Regions:
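Short, low-complexity disordered leader/linker segments with a strong preference
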Residues: 2-52
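Early extracytoplasmic/lumenal segment of secretory-pathway proteins
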Residues: 43-123, 133-134
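Extracytoplasmic
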Residues: 48, 81-83, 95, 103-105, ...
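Alpha-to-beta junction loops
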Residues: 103-110, 167-168, 230-238
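A conserved helix-loop-strand patch within extracytoplasmic ligand-binding domains
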Residues: 121-193
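Residues embedded in well-ordered beta-strands
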Residues: 146-148, 255, 268-270
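Extracellular/periplasmic juxtamembrane helices and adjacent flexible linkers that interface
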Residues: 276-315
Length: 315
């Protein structure tokens, strides 16, 4: 068992390293891990024809992970000869984090912000230091916050100040359940702070903004549905990727307004240590997140309107 543990640590180090070495060695090491069973008691998983993992993610990543899972399934089978079945769960990031912390078995989490994963880590399920487990602070792609308005921008919404007007109705998710909503809040606060406003004034501005919100959905995709399908609101505060996806699906019906100030959003990923060790799924779970940094996956992120962490591909 000690030799297997040492071997596992070696494997993990190589899989987490970047560049072509990781790509060359991943197949050999992953196959060897499966052959050895990695830990005592994990032999049945290693010998199984199919392994299953659960990815608990936030609302607007549905299309990204639907495509990525197909890519990863092919990659894993080519590397190891074993099939992998990936179960997806999507919802407001804060709500998803609480579900995992309260017992929803997730092998990996791909959530909207570091704080939501810290909620799970604080429950003892994820080891501390998760932001250093993968490159770029464990954020394989980023985004920002923009406004989506209806064709012609009838209310002439140009910046955060306009969202305080009494004639403007706003759609944004609930910060209590949605990670995207918290990024929205931070972006607005950052703008008013940059205008030299006092904390007291900014707090009042935020109250006014939220008084203009018609519906506080639990997640970003719900807010998009409220704005697009239900036709409510003059402006949707949205992830950049979600806004571009909406324009792709409804060409000519909407416009993106880029406010003068916003924030760089860093969705974070992590392996749920307690779950993968219990389910003997660490090898496939770690490679699932590692492969998000591959050229193929980074290009896929860009195609889904995320900003790839790999700056060469982002160009």
């Amino acid at each position: 068992q000690d030799s297997r543990h040492r071997f596992y640590l070696c494997v993990t180090q190589v899989l987490r390293s970047g560049g072509t070495m990781r790509k060359r060695m991943a197949a050999i090491l992953a196959a060897a891990m499966l052959a050895m069973g990695t830990f005592a008691g994990c032999g049945s998983v290693a010998d199984a024809d199919t392994v299953e993992i659960v990815n608990v993610s936030y609302d607007p990543t549905r299309e990204l992970y639907q495509a990525y899972n197909t890519l990863f399934e092919k990659h894993w089978e080519e590397q190891t000869g074993q099939k992998v079945r990936i179960i997806q769960s999507h919802g407001g990031s804060g709500k998803q984090a609480l579900e995992v912390a309260n017992g929803l078995d997730a092998d990996v989490v791909t959530l909207a912000l570091e704080g939501d994963i810290k909620t799970i880590s604080d429950s003892g399920l994820i080891d501390p230091g998760f932001t250093s487990e993968f490159p770029d602070d464990s954020a394989p792609y980023t985004s920002t916050i923009v406004f989506l308005v209806r064709k012609g921008n009838p209310k002439q919404i140009k910046d955060w100040d306009d969202l305080l007007r009494s004639d403007v109705s706003v759609i944004t998710p609930n910060p209590k359940t949605s990670g995207g909503a918290r990024w929205n809040y931070l972006a607005a606060w950052y703008y008013f702070e940059g205008q030299g406003e006092s904390e007291e004034n900014i707090t009042e501005h935020m109250k006014t903004l939220y008084q203009n919100v018609l519906v506080l959905d639990s997640g970003a995709r719900g807010s998009t549905t409220t704005f697009i399908e239900n036709g409510q609101g003059d402006v949707l505060i949205a992830w950049e990727n979600e806004a571009f996806l909406s324009m792709q699906e409804e060409p000519g019906e909407y416009e993106i307004v880029v406010p003068s100030a916003s924030v760089l959003c860093q969705p974070t990923v992590a392996v749920v240590d307690e779950v993968v060790d219990r389910r003997c799924s660490r090898a496939v779970a770690e490679e699932y997140l590692n492969y998000l940094y591959s050229d193929e996956a980074q290009k896929l992120a860009g195609e889904n309107y995320y900003r790839p962490a790999d700056q060469d591909i982002a160009k």
